[in-house]
Amino acid sequence: MRAAEDLVSLGESRCAQPRKSMKRICIDRNRPLAEEPHTGHNRFHPGIAPICAVAPGEEILLETRDAFDGQLPPGSDDRDIARMDGGRVHPLTGPLWIEGAAPGDGLEIEFLDITPEAHGVSCILPGFGLLRDRFPDPYLVHWRIADGWATAERLPGIRVPGAPFLGVSLRASAS
């Protein structure tokens, strides 16, 4: 990934264009992962073919999808939780092939910049989680992320540090 000052916006695609030549994995947030399988997967397995090869020390720009693959956009409500397609959740960008890496090698990945979207969600999914018996109904919160903070109209007076969170980053096993 590159620092923000080295990126130029491409407008609606929301993919950043590096000033210098750099590999990029860009996504269309208006389409589900199933319509863009060349960008990733959502069921990690070592048999999934890499989407891009990266040399040691090479920088690459990756875009990621939200945990629900865009199924809870701004304007969605509690009822939309029940309509979600569970087969679409947890989309992952990748995998990447690291040139020269072999089984047993230790790999170091440095994330140079993580830029969150301006909108995020959190929700209570019926039947899931530690407190599922106490919270049986769906509950959706839309977060506005700006200036380092996340706020939500549904939770007045609550302000949470809006620290970017990648989700997961993992290395494939040899088999």
Where are these regions (language model features)?
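Short, compositionally biased
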Residues: 73-89, 120-133
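Short, solvent-exposed loop/turn positions at domain surfaces
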Residues: 47-48, 92-95
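A generic structural signal for residues embedded in beta-strands
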Residues: 62, 106-109
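N-terminal, Lys/Arg-enriched amphipathic/low-complexity engagement segments
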Residues: 23-84
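Short, well-ordered loop/turn sites that connect or cap secondary structure elements
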Residues: 54, 98-101
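Short, charged beta-turn/beta-strand-edge "cap" motif at the junction between a beta-strand
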Residues: 65-69, 112-117
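Intrinsically disordered, low-complexity linker/loop segments enriched in Gly/Pro
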Residues: 113-175
